[in-house]
From Swiss-Prot:
Main localisation: cytoplasm
UniProt KW keywords: Cytoplasm, Schiff base, Thiamine biosynthesis, Transferase
Organism from which the protein derives: Clostridium perfringens (strain ATCC 13124 / DSM 756 / JCM 1290 / NCIMB 6125 / NCTC 8237 / Type A)
GO molecular function (one): thiazole synthase activity
Gene name of this polypeptide: thiG
The family this protein is said to belong to: Belongs to the ThiG family.
One example of a Gene Ontology biological process annotation: thiamine diphosphate biosynthetic process
UniProt GO cellular component terms: cytoplasm
Cross-referenced Pfam families: ThiG (PF05690)
The organism's place on the tree of life at top rank: Bacteria
Protein name stated in the entry: Thiazole synthase
Length: 254
C-alpha cells in the first residue's frame, strides 16, 4: 500500500477539508473529528490573533496541519506576500497557492501560480498549488518545487463533480507527484470516483460546509475517500462491452 508523504510528513487520512462557509467556527472541530482529516485549509482573513472568539485557530487541534491559502491574490507577487505573512503569523511552512484574477469562474492562473511556486519553494515553503488541470503546467510546477499539485475537478464551490476527469487522469498517469483533487467535488461518490482513478487525496469544503449536517457529511466523505483508495489499490477489473457470466453456463444439465 502506497504511503502519501508530503513535505516529509506521512498523511494517513487522504481527505483534506476546508474551513470556510460553516455556520460557525465552533463546528470545525467536530468536522475534523468526523472526517479524521490531518490537513485543513484556511484563509488568512479568518485568522484573528487579537480576538480569540473569532479566531478560527482556536477550533483547530494542534496536531492538524494548517494549509493557509493565498485566497484574494490576483498575481504571483500578491500570493508570495500572503504566504510570507502566513508564516510570520505562525501558520507554518505549508501553503496552498491560489492565484485567481477571474471573478466569474474563479479559475486559477497557472502561469502566475508557477511563478509564485518557484519563489516560495526556494524560501522553504511546502507548496501545494491550486491549478487548472494541464499536464505541461503540472510538469513546470514540479520543476518549480511543488510538493503536490491540486487540479480542480470543477469551478470552486460549484459542487459539480469531476468535470475535468480525463485531464486529471492524464496527470495522475504521467506525473510522479501527489495529485490532490481540489474544488468542485459535491458528493461523497464524486470523491470516491477521484480516488478510484488514482488521486492521492481530495480536498472538500463546500460540499461538507453547505450540507444540512456537516458532521455526518464529513464522515460520509471520509468513508468515500477510504473506499475509493482501497478500490484503486485493489486494481479494479476491466470494463467489457460484452456480457461475461460469473457462473458456468454449461455442464450443469449435460
Amino acid at each position: 500500500m502506497d504511503k502519501l508523504i508530503i513535505g516529509g510528513v506521512e498523511i494517513k487520512n487522504r481527505l483534506f477539508v476546508g474551513s470556510g462557509k460553516y455556520p460557525s467556527n465552533e463546528i470545525i472541530k467536530d468536522v475534523l473529528e468526523g472526517s479524521g482529516s490531518q490537513v485543513i485549509t484556511l484563509a488568512l482573513r479568518r485568522v484573528d490573533l487579537d480576538n480569540k472568539e473569532e479566531d478560527i485557530l482556536q477550533n483547530i487541534p494542534k496536531d492538524v496541519i494548517l494549509l493557509p491559502n493565498t485566497s484574494g491574490a490576483t498575481n504571483a507577487e500578491e500570493a508570495i506576500r500572503i504566504a510570507r505573512i502566513a508564516r510570520a503569523m505562525g501558520c507554518g511552512n505549508w501553503i496552498k497557492i491560489e492565484v485567481i484574477s477571474d471573478s466569474k469562474y474563479l479559475l486559477p492562473d497557472n502561469e502566475e501560480t508557477i511563478k509564485a511556486t518557484k519563489v516560495l519553494a526556494d524560501e522553504g515553503f511546502i507548496v501545494l498549488p491550486y491549478m487548472c488541470p494541464d499536464l505541461y503546467a503540472g510538469r513546470r510546477l514540479i520543476e518549480a518545487g511543488a510538493a503536490a499539485v491540486m487540479p480542480l475537478g470543477a469551478p470552486i464551490g460549484s459542487n459539480r463533480g469531476l468535470k475535468t476527469k480525463e485531464l486529471i487522469q492524464i496527470m495522475i498517469d504521467e506525473l510522479d507527484i501527489p495529485i490532490i483533487v481540489d474544488a468542485g467535488i459535491g458528493k461523497p461518490s464524486q470523491a470516491m470516483e477521484a480516488m478510484e482513478i488514482g488521486a492521492a487525496a481530495c480536498l472538500v469544503n463546500t460540499a461538507i460546509a453547505s450540507s444540512e449536517d456537516p458532521i455526518n457529511m464529513a464522515r460520509a466523505f471520509k468513508m468515500a475517500v477510504e473506499g475509493g483508495r482501497l478500490a484503486y489499490e485493489a486494481k479494479m477489473g476491466r470494463e467489457s462491452k460484452f456480457g461475461n457470466a460469473s457462473s458456468p453456463l454449461t455442464g450443469f444439465l449435460d
